């Protein structure tokens, strides 16, 4: 057969095959190919992880190109649960879409829309009340009755200028929250108190996990040496809570309810102590601990000062179900809320927002902080909100962040910060004893829970239901 005749036959076969295809098949193209076409058509650069997008295809790809780049990218990416964000004059990133994170630009637009709805202090207070009630209702906390707060203490020890004692609180019948209380060794009268929840910081052993980590011990002990009582406590289904509930339950929505409830009960406990000044109670935590900081401050006026660290963001809602696993940001009959609005509910109470340059708080000085100042201005109290931004720091509660917090708390709660400063005036944490995790176990090495301790989330749900009767 002659070559020319062979080519003709092949072309005819190809034509017949194409004629037998549906439009969906004809226009189906690999995403990588489509994105390259976008770059060529609009003269832009798209940055993305090829492995992350591997195997994805675009239906009716050729028909998703419009006169403007934005519409084109929306039509291509949204059906695939992808999103884009402008990062330069003609460059964009393409990433997976997650329900708990938006783009920086969308976060800024959201704040702009929200602030326009607060004509004055009165309208803000109305919105604040609605958001607060929504947080309580969605978590199922509104109707929960408080049971007697049983307190179990163990392993009291003394260190340089402070003491530590392990404490478990029975926050619901048969449900225990474990923590450690740090106090100054010597004090007179009533002293300030701080809640210290932790975030999602992991280690190979308990010594590097959650509240047992050195950074949490440093901040609690240093505050105690300065003159405050500090309650450091574990997240739900972490630490000793995992003796009752499997750690996997931490990553479910019930964890959000329990962590908020735990913070409320910690407040109850601190307010019950005769040596604690109820007018000087604050809270600070990083990452997921920052989320807990904002939520408890938003819903409970007993918190008089807050320091949310590496968490407050207009576009990031918290990547764990213990932070965003329930629709606490979705307001019926009103615009959606976000963590900046939650944070603003602290106003006019003192708040320090600590941010860094390597996570979702990287734009805080430009986006979130100016917005917060506008809310505080409604009360004439702009001086009560501050931002310490550390552009070269990473996502943690490291020394640079801790010293900013020490200074802020000392100024507002009249703590004796000179006690923990060296001759140059720099904060010195060398007098803190870093304990192994086992020293902080309320139920000891034997992990002996009280006899009435429940086990499993099904039992917990029944207890919660009983608390609403």
Question: What residue spans do the PLM features occupy?
Answer:
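N-terminal export/assembly leaders
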Residues: 20-98
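The feature captures the conserved acid-bearing segment of alpha/beta-hydrolase catalytic domains
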Residues: 317-377
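Cap/lid segment of the alpha/beta-hydrolase catalytic domain
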Residues: 188-272, 312-322, 328
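Bacterial Sec-dependent N-terminal signal peptides
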Residues: 1-25
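Carboxylate/His-rich catalytic cores and anion/metal-binding grooves
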Residues: 177, 181-182, 193-194, 217-233, ...
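Primarily recognizes the serine-hydrolase "nucleophile elbow" in alpha/beta-hydrolase
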Residues: 268-335
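Glycine-rich active-site/cofactor-binding loop and its immediate structural neighborhood
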Residues: 155-212
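Alpha/beta-hydrolase-fold serine-hydrolase catalytic core, especially in secreted/extracellular enzymes
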Residues: 96-176, 354-469
